[in-house]
Amino acid sequence: MRPTGKLHLGNLHGALANWKRLQEQYECYFFVADWHALTSDYQDASHVQEYTWEMLIDWLSAGLDPEKATIFIQSKVPEHTELHLLFSMITPLPWLERNPTYKEQRKELIEKDLNTYGFLGYPVLQAADILIYKAHLVPVGVDQLPHIELTREIARRFNYLYKKEVFPLPEPLLAEVPKLLGIDGRKMSKSYHNAIYLSDSPEVIKEKVSQMFTDKSRLRKSDPGHPDICNVFSFHKIYTPAETVAQIEEDCKNAKIGCVECKKCLAENLIQGILPHQERRHYYETHAGELKEIVEFGIKKAQMVARASLEEAKAAVGI
């Protein structure tokens, strides 16, 4: 996960909820991808360190357990970059140029100069991030599938060129997660300025919820609503008690409750729902020494594995 901004509810109920489940079943490595943040934010990286520690606080507050998973910062394990260099020597340029994510982001992020090797080649760094721990499964969304396939191709090519099965071919691990849209109905994203952040105060949450888009076909309170297509209702299903959700659904369909009242109810439940997370955030914010120890422990664990993999790869190459 790249530290390019604060984490929001979409992150909490998407990647973090999934990672929390996975750490109970697998040996997991979770790292803050601060080098990857530089692919798009290289002109001003002053915020990367701040967001890195904010991200780690949110991860721990969301339930990632340093006793069950290895949690660390990418740039503190320099073996990633050395393996990336080895991979960059064998990766054909057309493999990178046909990457659909590369093409899409070039179109979307028009305000940034992305004509750099770092941006074109970041999937090679991703491959190093994955293969240096000899990962067999990688939790990803559908949009990341091309990157996993490229990682497999790089591993296959490396093994073929140096006639040794150094790296496994990882498989994607897809998971269904609740789709929480931003307050404007688009994908929740810091880039769209439509996110509800895990660090938002109750006052800010109330203000953002009051701005949320609702059922466009419901123009008046007396009009029957359609909860199944209302963004507010999708949040209710996560943060409001089930019996209340059922009542809201019925009242909305029968025009017994208006959108303003519905949003006020959601805001109160959402504030209470993320309160435990925010209390844990406050704990780590005020116990910086403990946070640092957790991360340093994860860095040492990761580096032991990464160093062994790198040495094996270098031996296969003959350097």
Protein language model regions, located:
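Short, flexible loop/turn elements at secondary-structure junctions
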Residues: 1-3, 75, 184, 200
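Conserved nucleotide- and phosphate/pyrophosphate-binding catalytic cores
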Residues: 11, 146, 152-319
